[in-house]
């Protein structure tokens, strides 16, 4: 007889401040944005990592935070509506705005982030690839916290596992079968492993090649997500799609190709010292108050 790990009981509310209740997923978003902001500021302050002054100032980064926060939330929600449950939201459109009931998509949030980077850079005359590098370098922080929140909320659990698997567990809403804690797999792959790889790349000079961190994040995240999807239970309203693939796999496969193409272009282009992608105004912008 196998002994299964008992799923721990968590209070759905992480922090209570009088009538205000902050749930774990909201706390993950807040923590991811705040920690990512601090890490991004540290990257921009290190001229050694860029081979000179960073093409984006800390003040400009501070302005960008509001843009990307809105983009992640709106994009994540729109992505979930379009990719995962369009029929339901066509019948109940008012539910689209009820974010507290759950339903966010990484792929939608990422596309929102891409749009925010492009629009912000065009407005302020900044290099798109360099801001994309910074934004994706901090991405694994939010991914890690988000997956931990998924685990605490007992959602997005894994497929049924062999009862002999030492860490298999029975989730409250997952039926009587022991399941893979796929949220923790994703936290390890998309969060810890991806952050470590990108941090090592940055230490070795990746920021000197605009787009290298961005492309690596896109490709490596997609690969990690595809692997995790083999252990994750598909969304019940979708199930398995073509050839046994899941929606997460279908959305991630193109990301591998796009990411590798960006990596190839970044490596072929050369370092920032010889790169003409920086806008004419970027040199002046690095001389403003860098906080």
UniProtKB/Swiss-Prot annotation:
UniProt cross-references to InterPro entries, sorted A to Z: Lgt (IPR001640)
GO cellular component assignments: plasma membrane
Any one GO biological process: lipoprotein biosynthetic process
EC numbers, comma separated: 2.5.1.145
Enzyme class (EC, first level): transferase
Binding site for a 1,2-diacyl-sn-glycero-3-phospho-(1'-sn-glycerol): 147
GO molecular function terms attached to this record: phosphatidylglycerol-prolipoprotein diacylglyceryl transferase activity
Regions crossing the membrane: 24-44, 64-84, 100-120, 125-145, 187-207, 211-231, 247-267
Ranges in a coiled coil: none
Keywords linked to the UniProt accession: Cell inner membrane, Cell membrane, Membrane, Transferase, Transmembrane, Transmembrane helix
Topological relation to the membrane, as annotated: Multi-pass membrane protein
Role summary: Catalyzes the transfer of the diacylglyceryl group from phosphatidylglycerol to the sulfhydryl group of the N-terminal cysteine of a prolipoprotein, the first step in the formation of mature lipoproteins.
PANTHER family from the UniProt entry: PHOSPHATIDYLGLYCEROL--PROLIPOPROTEIN DIACYLGLYCERYL TRANSFERASE, PROLIPOPROTEIN DIACYLGLYCERYL TRANSFERASE
Family to which the UniProt record says this protein belongs: Belongs to the Lgt family.
Protein name per its UniProtKB record: Phosphatidylglycerol--prolipoprotein diacylglyceryl transferase
């Amino acid at each position: 007889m196998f002994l299964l790990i008992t799923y721990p009981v968590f209070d759905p509310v992480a922090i209570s401040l009088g009538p205000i209740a902050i749930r774990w997923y909201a706390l993950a978003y807040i923590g991811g944005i705040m920690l990512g902001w601090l890490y991004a500021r540290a990257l921009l302050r290190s001229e050694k990592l860029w081979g000179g002054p960073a093409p984006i100032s800390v003040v400009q980064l501070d302005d960008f935070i509001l843009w990307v926060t809105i983009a992640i939330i709106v994009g994540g929600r729109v992505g979930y509506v379009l990719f995962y449950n369009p029929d339901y939201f066509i019948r109940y459109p008012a539910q689209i705005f009820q974010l507290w009931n759950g339903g966010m998509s990484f792929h939608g949030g990422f596309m929102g982030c891409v749009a925010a980077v492009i629009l912000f850079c065009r407005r302020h005359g900044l290099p798109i690839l360099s801001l994309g590098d910074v934004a994706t370098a901090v991405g694994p922080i939010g991914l890690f916290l988000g997956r931990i929140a998924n685990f605490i909320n007992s959602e997005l659990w894994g497929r049924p596992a062999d009862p002999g698997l030492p860490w298999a567990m029975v989730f409250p809403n997952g039926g009587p079968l022991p399941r893979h804690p796929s949220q923790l797999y994703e936290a390890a792959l998309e969060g810890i492993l991806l952050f470590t790889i990108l941090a090592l790349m940055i230490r070795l000079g990746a920021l000197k090649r605009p787009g290298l961190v961005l492309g690596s994040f896109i490709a490596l995240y997609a690969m990690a997500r595809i692997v995790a999807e083999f252990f994750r239970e598909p969304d019940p309203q979708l199930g398995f799609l073509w050839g046994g693939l899941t929606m997460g796999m279908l959305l991630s496969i193109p990301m591998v190709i796009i990411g590798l193409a960006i990596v190839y272009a970044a490596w072929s282009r050369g370092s920032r010292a010889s790169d003409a992608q920086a806008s004419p105004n970027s040199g002046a912008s690095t001389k403003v108050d860098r906080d």
